[in-house]
Amino acid sequence: MPRIGAILIGQSPRPDLVKPLQKANPHFQYIESGALDFVDEADIPATPRGEYILTTRLRDGRIVEVDEKFLFPLLQKAIADVERQGVTLSVLLCAGPFDGLSGEKPLYRPTAMASTIMHSRGSQRIAVLSPNQTQASAINQKWIDRGFSPIILVDPGLPDVELAHWIKSQLSFTSVDHLVIDYVGHPIEKAKTLEQILNISVIDLGKIIGDMLRHITP
């Protein structure tokens, strides 16, 4: 069975992130490798400092915050790890941009994929749902750097239907081309619910990889 690399910013395994990929395309074997597999837990900075702080999980389920720059070389190791195991391509299961990350085989990054899709549609004004206030500033700059005019909304943690109405109230009198869900690890039904109620195109960085995999044949 052909293999696809599933690149994680935390520790492997992450069945909650990989099972949706298996459901999207069961004709591949998914080889997981996590950035934090390559460091001792004691070496993970207790107080991360940097422009882009990301949240992930350790193997035991604990949540940690890590800086994009700390993760970058570790992700390169994770890519090399899955490529040694014969993958045909790799997918990054994280909404962080990680510009410059690469391997010998094709690597698909959600932020880059979403940017390409929106530019192909001529979109510029976008609303972006940030997972928390900590990441809001970095997420805002990420989309500005890619040529968009973002409106950043920090997810208040409401159920999907209530969240949709909250977003609608936040965007009153404002027109946007897309709503971007800028995080991963949530139920795939979230985007569908928001799209139906808001009546705007929703691009979900947690779902975009699975959507792509449905169109790949071994």
Q: What are the language-model segments listed below?
A:
Residues 14-15, 98-101, 114-116, 136-137, ...:
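Short, well-ordered alpha-helical microsegments
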Residues 38, 123, 158-159, 202-218:
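Short, flexible loop segments at boundaries between secondary-structure elements
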Residues 88, 162-166, 177-198, 205, ...:
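Hydrophobic alpha-helical
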Residues 82, 143, 170-173, 194:
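Generic structural signal for hydrophobic
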Residues 91-97, 102-136, 141-145, 149, ...:
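Conserved mixed alpha/beta catalytic, RNA-binding, or beta-rich assembly cores of soluble enzyme
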Residues 66-111, 177-191:
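N-terminal glycine-rich phosphate/adenylate-binding segment common to multiple enzyme folds
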Residues 73, 158-169:
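Structural motif
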Residues 1-66, 130-162:
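N-terminal glycine-rich anion-binding loop in soluble enzyme alpha/beta folds
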